[in-house]
Design a protein with these regions (language model features):
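Sec-dependent signal peptide recognition
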Residues: 2-10
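Hydrophobic h-region of N-terminal signal peptides that target proteins for export
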Residues: 10-18
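Short, cysteine/histidine-rich loop/knuckle motifs that typically chelate Zn2+
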Residues: 143
């Protein structure tokens, strides 16, 4: 019992004095966590598209994308979100600072420049954030984010679930948004 108490004390103390992550560690962790999230969402999406088609997959995403994201965040001890300027889910709207980065990347694409794999930025509040571009890189993305016929059942389902949807009209290679990982 006493040993347990001493151990607990050390454990709590080590948490309190834990060294902040180095830049290298943040890059490594950010890359790891964002890859996990993309894989997790991608696998679910693929399964749902194959078994139920785009409308079922749409409903699955609207009900589970955020909780799957939270799960990855919890497991990694970070905060993660996906944001976009042309967002579908209002929760995923980019902030002012995030828009500035997305606009910068948008301009790079326009100039046929290659996007960085990630960007690490120290915010004015002292926190460092890892950003990773999300590009439309699969035909499957266009099913729900491309040109969708206005009178199709899918268009209706999108409109019902997301009356403010802005996330259609994308083409292959377009910047769709980014993953934001905060430490
Ligand atoms: C079955 C339809 C469907 C497909 C296919 C699909 N998405 Fe989405 N997407 C959604 C829905 C619904 C949301 C909103 C719910 C959420 O994920 O938070 C969304 C949201 C997003 C967001 C978050 C920003 C926002 O607009 O809310 C990104 C980024 C995104 N999708 C990228 C992609 C990419 C990249 C692909 C291809 C790999 C893809 N999506 C394929 C339906 C789809």
């Amino acid at each position: 019992m006493k040993r347990l108490a001493v151990f607990s004390l050390f454990f709590i103390a080590s948490l309190l004095i834990a060294e902040p992550l180095t830049q290298e560690q943040m890059i490594q962790k950010g890359t790891e966590v964002s890859t996990t999230l993309v894989q997790k969402l991608g696998n679910e999406l693929k399964t749902q598209m194959q078994t139920g088609g785009p409308i079922a997959a749409l409903h699955f995403c609207s009900q589970n994308a955020l909780s799957l994201t939270d799960q990855v965040a919890k497991e990694s001890g970070t905060a993660i979100k996906r944001v976009s300027i042309q967002n579908r889910n209002p929760v995923n709207a980019a902030t002012f600072e995030e828009k500035a980065i997305l606009n910068q990347w948008q301009a790079m694409l326009k100039n046929s420049e290659t996007l960085p794999a990630y960007q690490l930025t120290k915010l004015s509040n002292g926190h460092t954030v890892y950003y990773k571009p999300i590009v439309i890189n699969k035909d499957a993305c266009l099913k729900c984010h491309g040109d969708i016929a206005g009178d199709s059942p899918l268009a209706k389902a999108i409109k019902e679930t997301y009356p403010e949807d802005q996330a259609t009209g994308y083409k292959m290679g377009d910047l769709r948004g980014m993953i934001v990982v905060a430490f």
